[in-house]
């Protein structure tokens, strides 16, 4: 997969970030991951100059052979999108990790620009707030909902608790203080 330098990434007028939604025990993408990748592929067709960042290692459980990010990238390429446009962030295991690692690896070194954040409908509020807390107000972030997955209703029940955990984790850290966020994430993951 292409690991563009920030200088190459900065040429893209817009960025699409798609968040993984889990992997099944056999190592295949969960329905939420597939739906999110489909939505990202659809969005990419109408934003021909945007760079795409697929974010996610895996959620709970053992690490599969292929990350959520790599699996989503493969699906997006199968939908006709050039692989050279796709970047991977494959360390994160949750939404805070998505925001911190995407920012640390790719976004911190480039000027702010419009960004589309693709995730499940139930996950939009928390993911948008998390990325805004990490990146700060200079970044114009728009949420894009994928089609719902069969387990979205069950997963949505946990969102208020996860949002409180996110706010607590990032409390006292200013947007853009990525090194502090990375250090805190490595020291005490929010899970």
Regions from the PLM with identified roles:
Residues 150-191:
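C-terminal capping/extension of enzyme domains
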Residues 1-159:
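A structural signal for short, hydrophobic/glycine-enriched beta-strand patches
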């Amino acid at each position: 997969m292409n690991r563009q330098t920030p200088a190459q990434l900065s040429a893209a007028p817009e960025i699409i970030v798609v968040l993984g939604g889990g992997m099944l025990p056999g190592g295949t993408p969960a329905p939420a991951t597939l739906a999110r990748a489909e939505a990202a592929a659809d969005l990419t067709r109408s934003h021909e100059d945007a760079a795409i960042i697929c974010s996610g290692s895996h959620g709970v459980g053992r690490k599969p052979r292929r990350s959520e990010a790599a699996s989503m990238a493969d699906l997006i390429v199968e939908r006709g999108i050039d692989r050279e446009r796709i970047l991977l962030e494959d360390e994160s295991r949750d939404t805070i990790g998505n925001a911190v690692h995407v920012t640390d690896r790719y976004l911190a070194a480039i000027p702010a620009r419009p960004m589309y954040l693709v995730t499940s409908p139930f996950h939009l509020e928390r993911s948008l707030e998390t990325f805004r807390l990490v990146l700060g107000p200079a970044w114009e972030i728009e949420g894009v909902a994928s089609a719902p997955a069969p387990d979205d209703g069950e997963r949505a029940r946990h969102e208020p608790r996860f949002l409180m955990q996110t706010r607590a984790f990032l409390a006292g850290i200013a947007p853009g203080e990525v090194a502090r966020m990375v250090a805190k994430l490595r020291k005490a993951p929010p899970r």
